[in-house]
Amino acid sequence: MSQTQSLAVKTRAGLGKGACRKLRADDMVPGVYYDAKGVNVPVMVEHLPLQKLYSKIASSHVFDLQIEGETKPALVWKVEHHPTKPRITHVDFYGVDLTKEIQVRVPVEVVGKSKGQVKGGQLEIHREFIEVLCLPLVIPDKIVLDITNVDINESILIADVVLPEGVKAVYDNNYAVIGVLASAAEAAGEGA
């Protein structure tokens, strides 16, 4: 991303359910800023600027968090939404050290139509996100998987996913990210 986004927040004194309800009634969102060194700071932020920022960068981009005049690099770490309204009810920010690698979830985007789908197979997406380890400023927007060469009963494994330079997938077992299965009719035809 060429231009760093920014968001201004204020520290808050009131903690607990009652204080948070009062903030939400005033169109503010309660939250917590977790410093890279382990310091937690209760904060509040206006809903509209937070919503605009989150819709642009989600959880995979570093932005400048301005706390009482001090600017800190941060990620939106966790967001809670209202169950029936399009509103953010709570947000957690994570302060990052730009020189240390962090582990984040990056969305997967599947492109193309596989050979297996052309033959009647069904695409199975096993993972919508991939955990990666990288420096905060090189977090990819998304991981694009081209599936055009995947045939029926084949998969793309996490070890086979091509990642940008400086980005490593985090996994213990070599799991399938996507696969193409035979359709139920084809599977029944093979068994007969």
From Swiss-Prot:
According to UniProt, the name of this protein is: Large ribosomal subunit protein bL25
Q: What does this protein do?
A: This is one of the proteins that binds to the 5S RNA in the ribosome where it forms part of the central protuberance.
Q: Which UniProt keywords apply?
A: Ribonucleoprotein, Ribosomal protein, RNA-binding, rRNA-binding
Subunit note: Part of the 50S ribosomal subunit; part of the 5S rRNA/L5/L18/L25 subcomplex. Contacts the 5S rRNA. Binds to the 5S rRNA independently of L5 and L18.
In the record, biological process GO terms are: translation
Single GO MF annotation: structural constituent of ribosome
Give yes or no: UniProt keyword Ribosomal protein.
yes
Mind telling me which CDD domains this protein's record contains?
A: Ribosomal_L25_TL5_CTC
GO CC term, one of those recorded: cytosolic large ribosomal subunit
Starting at the broadest rank, the lineage of the source organism is: Bacteria, Pseudomonadati, Thermodesulfobacteriota, Desulfovibrionia, Desulfovibrionales
Instruction: Specify whether rRNA-binding is a keyword of the entry.
Output: yes
Similarity annotation = Belongs to the bacterial ribosomal protein bL25 family. CTC subfamily.
Pfam families, sorted: Ribosomal_L25p (PF01386), Ribosomal_TL5_C (PF14693)
